[in-house]
Structure formats: structure tokens, C-alpha cells
């Protein structure tokens, strides 16, 4: 496919992925200030906290306080994640303040799945009916199934597209057997193995099997190919991406400490702007949010546009200079 989408949907995941990855304490006020700044950028979906055990993820101990403290912008979906039934119950109590997305995560690698959940991929899929039932009780008769390590794994090597399709087929069969359905597919390059050709191969293979199911990509910039992979995905017609302001985040189970986190929101918005793809996001406001994110965490973050700036600013200066001359 040579044509790229006219518009794309971007979910901002920086606060959730970024805060949980930080070792130093971050104040509730600083967390809220970043979410509020993101709310003013035009992004339509912000994943900003997790309902998880504070014992294991202390940065997420203030999930309820964050939800109570943020200033909601019209038209913005505020989202969270959960890893177990207790987390979902906490989220469900606040569904007037949250957009609940019925999600179920698996992986293309048994080793990575075990490090994440202490279960094999097949054991994890056996848990899907229980999740489907919980979501159905909340009036959500579908699941979005995300495949972590969909392109490669630091423990097992390359992950072939047929492996990902097999995992998704098993998940779909379990969902349909209990009256649910596959609502969306997420493909995550959790450890930064993907290259543009792999993106096209996997997206093409998945779309051949599920031509009418939305596909979302969650890409990490571990080996500096995330933006190139976004271009490849756009060329395949993918129109939904997870991104993180200033490149916040990472994966604690990926076996490479200090590696770059998620693909940077402002870099992707800039890419789309230059390619004529509409995101609905104010790039200058997102650059400001990226600079704020860096101040909040107290150390440099990998996003490029924080220092490089928006080309439209330079174009405007150049036009003004020509007029003056």
C-alpha cells in the first residue's frame, strides 16, 4: 500500500509507562501537572496510571488520587491499565471518571510471558474466558488483544508472523467460545527488534487473517528504528499508535537496562505533520509537554523535538525574512 492514512489516532502512554519506570519519587502534583499539560495538546486518549500493587510498582500507589486531581478536557479519553481482577475492580469503581478498555495481553515469546506473568503463553490464554466474563458484566462484550514481543525477544530471538497469528487465533477462539469477540489487535515491539520490512510482513499477515479488525502498534525505540517503523506502518494503512511524550518509559522485563523507551509522541506528530497526515495534536504544545516531562522526572529524555523544534516555526521565520527583504 503506497497511500498513507489521512488521519491517525495517537494514544499518549507516557505518564503511565514513564512514571512506573522511574526509580526516584515523583510528587502527585508533578504527575497531575504533566497529564494536564497533555490534555491541552489535542491528543484524544491519555493512558496515565495503573491499578497495580504499590508493593511492586510504588509510583502507581496514587492512582485514585491522580484520577481525582486531573483537569479533564472535553473529548479526551482518560485511561488506565490493570493486571488482575483486583485492579479491574478498582478501575470499575471509577468508570465515571475513566474510559475502560477491555484489554488482554499475551506475548509472542513464552520466556518473556513468564517473566511478565509467571505463566506460559498458553497458560495465559486459558485465563481469557475469566477476563471476558468480567468485561461482559461491565457491559463490554469484546476484548482488545495485545501481543507483546510480537517482532522479537531478547530471550528467544526473532518472532515469526505465523507465531503471532497462532497466538491471536487461540485468543480469538477462547473469546468466541464464551460469547465475546476480538475487538482490536495490538502489536508491540516491546524490546525494539522490529525493522520496517518486519512491520510490513507482520501487519500484512495479520490483516490477511483479520481484514476488518483494527490494528494498533506499540513501538519502542530501543535501536533507533521506531520512527522508520511508523513510516512503514503508515504505508500499510495502520492508523493507530501508542506513543510517549519525550520518549518516557521502557520495559522492566526486557533485559537491557537503560534502553530507550516508547516512540516519542512529539517526534511522531512531527513526522505526520511533514507527511501531511492529520493527528489533531498541536505540535508546539506537545513539545512544551515533553520539556515539562523532562523537568518532572529530573533527567534527560530521548525525544528529539524538545531541542530540535517544529520546522513550521523556522518556515514562518524564513517567510517573514523574505517579506522583509
What is each PLM-predicted segment?
Residues 1-325:
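Catalytic cores and adjacent flexible loops of soluble metabolic enzymes
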Amino acid at each position: 500500500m503506497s497511500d498513507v492514512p489521512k488521519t491517525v489516532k495517537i494514544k499518549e502512554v507516557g505518564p503511565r509507562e514513564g512514571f512506573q519506570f522511574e526509580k526516584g519519587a515523583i510528587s502527585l502534583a508533578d504527575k497531575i501537572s504533566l497529564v494536564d499539560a497533555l490534555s491541552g495538546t489535542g491528543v484524544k486518549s491519555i493512558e496515565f496510571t495503573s491499578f497495580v500493587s504499590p508493593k511492586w510498582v510504588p509510583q502507581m500507589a496514587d492512582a485514585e488520587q491522580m484520577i481525582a486531581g486531573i483537569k479533564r478536557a472535553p473529548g479526551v479519553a482518560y485511561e488506565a491499565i490493570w493486571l488482575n481482577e483486583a485492579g479491574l475492580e478498582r478501575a470499575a469503581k471509577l468508570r465515571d471518571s475513566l474510559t475502560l478498555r477491555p484489554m488482554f495481553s499475551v506475548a509472542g515469546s513464552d520466556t518473556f510471558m513468564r517473566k511478565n506473568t509467571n505463566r506460559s503463553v498458553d497458560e495465559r490464554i486459558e485465563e481469557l474466558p475469566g477476563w471476558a466474563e468480567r468485561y461482559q458484566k461491565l457491559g463490554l462484550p469484546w476484548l482488545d488483544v495485545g501481543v507483546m514481543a510480537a517482532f522479537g525477544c531478547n530471550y528467544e530471538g526473532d518472532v515469526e508472523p505465523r507465531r503471532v497469528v497462532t497466538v491471536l487465533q487461540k485468543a480469538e477462539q477462547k473469546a468466541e467460545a464464551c460469547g465475546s469477540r476480538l475487538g482490536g489487535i495490538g502489536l508491540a515491539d516491546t524490546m525494539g527488534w522490529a525493522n520496517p520490512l518486519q512491520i510490513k510482513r507482520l501487519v500484512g499477515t495479520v490483516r490477511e487473517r483479520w481484514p476488518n479488525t483494527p490494528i494498533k502498534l506499540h513501538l519502542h525505540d530501543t535501536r533507533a528504528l521506531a520512527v522508520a517503523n511508523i513510516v512503514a506502518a503508515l504505508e500499510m494503512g495502520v492508523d493507530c499508535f501508542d506513543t510517549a511524550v519525550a520518549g518516557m518509559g521502557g520495559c522492566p522485563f526486557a533485559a537491557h537496562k537503560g534502553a530507550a523507551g516508547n516512540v516519542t509522541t512529539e517526534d511522531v506528530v512531527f513526522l505526520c505533520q511533514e507527511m501531511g497526515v492529520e493527528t489533531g495534536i498541536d505540535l508546539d504544545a506537545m513539545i512544551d509537554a515533553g520539556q515539562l516531562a523532562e523537568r518532572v522526572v529530573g533527567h534527560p529524555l530521548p525525544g528529539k523535538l524538545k531541542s530540535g523544534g517544529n520546522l513550521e516555526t523556522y518556515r514562518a521565520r524564513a517567510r517573514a525574512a523574505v517579506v522583509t527583504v
